[in-house]
A protein has these predicted regions:
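Active-site mouth of glycoside hydrolases
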Residues: 50-263, 267-274
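Signal peptide processing junction and immediate N-terminal pro/mature segment
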Residues: 28-36
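Active-site clefts of carbohydrate-active enzymes
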Residues: 212-213, 246-247, 261, 276-312
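Aromatic- and carboxylate-lined catalytic core of secreted/periplasmic carbohydrate-active enzymes
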Residues: 37, 296-298, 310-447, 458-482
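Short acidic, Pro/Gly- and aromatic-enriched capping/linker segments at domain boundaries
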Residues: 37-57
Length: 482
């Protein structure tokens, strides 16, 4: 995110207390604790790739739907007590992923934290390279044990609440100058340090980059990759992804990252189906997910669009019907924890994300194939967007189906009649309209519908929120879940 922030939160506990605590943690070798700390993560992490390469599974091979929030600025903004409050809230709302937490926070997104310290003023590094004493000259080969003990504890608190944590080892909005000042060898060494330290935590994955706009510069790309390579040299198990340029990109747009990553993240402020399908169709095949789009309560994009519940809802359903395996939600107040964030944590968008999770978790979402050839939905599709189309203005209808003909799912962002080729289903089907604003179903009269010919479907009016978007669910008779 490229929003400029001020007024860092005041620590609630005296700095001296935290410093003593951090040293005690280090001296008792926190890293020796079991990486599955917390009953919420037992038997789940680390996540891995499914046998067909299309989605994540846990350690029991159960499909893992990414339901992520994005607390990027947590290390620079929150006390441990605040972090636990936040994690507990996210667990209660059905989140299973924190994607992502920056190792250290400084630069354009954190202008009030010039030294990238924790709220109680612990620096991430203890020395500087030649040329200056600001954060861009931190010596990456001199990590501060007290600081990283704090990050250890944050990861363990997340594990306690069943949360997978994507760690950004050195985000690239503010820290590219630091990498340039350190050079390739130090960047690789820093990655090795992180790999050794965090390979013992099961609930970890890695998110490299962050608005990495200069990835086409081979020197910058090599520096960011050096950190990732260093991590992987010590820890080949935990998965990596990378966020490339704003405003639209996919991880695999830079093919040199392909050997390093296992997840293809989509970044877009345009209608999400466009870039999601681009990601889904890239090779090598990887799980695709919505890495970053509009955050709730924040205007972003070019042209800008405000993150209303309707906008983030469209992005969520378009994603899942365009090859997605989940998404990172975001919120203006909780990606950076600006003052007042506690009053903006349980929003309409979070409630509707919980509804989204419940809906797709009731289905074999991992088997959905995007209806790119329009053989399932043959009419009423609306207009395919452009990169300048605002999410709030796009009326494009997305659809997906399971290869065995059990389900066809259609998302309509605006009211219209759609035509479905009923032969896409293996048997006569039960048809329901799902309201994405309150999670209720409305049966389509006259069912079950024969699986022959074409059938038109029209939504039953306004949804509970007073908007026009609905989900059409067609489930073949005998389907296991509906």
């Amino acid at each position: 995110m490229q929003t400029i922030l001020t007024n860092c939160r005041t620590a609630r506990i005296p700095a001296a207390v935290f410093a003593v605590f951090a040293m005690l943690v280090a001296s008792t070798q926190l890293l020796a604790a079991p990486p599955q700390a917390g009953s919420g993560s037992a038997g789940v992490y680390p996540v891995k790739i499914s046998s067909n390469g299309r989605y994540l599974v846990d350690q029991k091979n159960v499909p893992f739907l990414i339901v992520g929030d994005t607390p990027q600025g947590l290390m620079g903004r929150l006390t441990e007590a605040q972090a636990e409050f936040y994690f507990a809230d996210r667990q209660a709302h059905g989140f299973n992923t924190m994607g992502w937490i920056d190792v250290a926070c400084a630069g354009p997104d954190y202008r009030d934290n010039k030294e990238a310290t924790t709220p109680d003023r612990i620096r991430p590094y203890t020395g500087f390279v030649a040329g200056g004493t600001d954060f861009t000259h931190y010596d990456l080969t001199k990590p501060n044990e007290a600081y990283f003990a704090r990050l250890d504890h944050v990861v363990m608190l997340a594990a306690k609440h069943g949360l997978l944590v994507f760690i950004d080892p050195i985000e690239t909005i503010g820290w590219l100058p630091t990498l340039r000042n350190n050079g390739l060898a130090s960047a690789y060494s820093y990655g090795q340090y992180l790999g050794r330290r965090y390979k013992r935590f099961a609930n970890v994955a890695w998110l490299n980059g962050n608005d990495f706009n200069s990835w086409k510069d081979p020197k910058d790309d090599a520096l960011v990759q050096a950190v990732a390579k260093g991590i992987k040299s010590e820890d080949p198990v935990h998965l990596h992804s990378v966020e490339l340029n704003v405003h639209t990109s996919s991880s695999l747009d830079d093919p040199t990252w392909a050997p390093l990553i296992a997840l293809n993240g989509t970044y877009t402020y345009s209608p999400t189906y466009m870039q999601m399908l681009h990601s889904y169709n890239q090779t090598p095949v990887m799980p695709t997910y919505l890495l970053e789009a509009h955050y709730e309560l924040e205007p972003v994009g070019d042209p800008p669009d405000f993150g209303t519940p309707s906008v983030v809802r469209r992005e969520e359903y378009w994603t899942m019907l365009s090859g997605g395996t989940g998404q990172f939600y975001g919120n203006k107040y909780t990606w950076s924890f600006v003052p007042g964030w506690e009053s903006h944590i349980d929003t309409v968008g979070v409630t509707q994300l919980t509804i989204w999770k419940k809906f797709f978790s009731s289905l074999p979402w991992q088997n959905l194939i995007p209806d790119q050839d329009h053989k399932a939905v043959t009419a009423g599709l609306g207009t395919w967007g452009t990169f300048q189309t605002r999410v709030s203005q796009s009326d494009y209808c997305t659809a997906a189906k399971t290869p065995d003909g059990s389900y066809v799912i259609v998302y309509l962002p605006t009211a219209r009649t759609v035509t479905v080729n009923m032969a896409s289903l293996k048997a006569s089907a039960h048809a329901k309209w799902f309201d994405p604003t309150n999670g209720t179903y409305t049966n389509v009269p006259g069912g079950p519908v024969a699986n022959t010919g074409a059938r038109q479907f029209t939504p039953p009016g306004k949804n509970h929120e007073g908007a026009d978007d609905w989900v059409l669910l067609l489930a073949a008779s005998g389907s296991s879940r509906h």
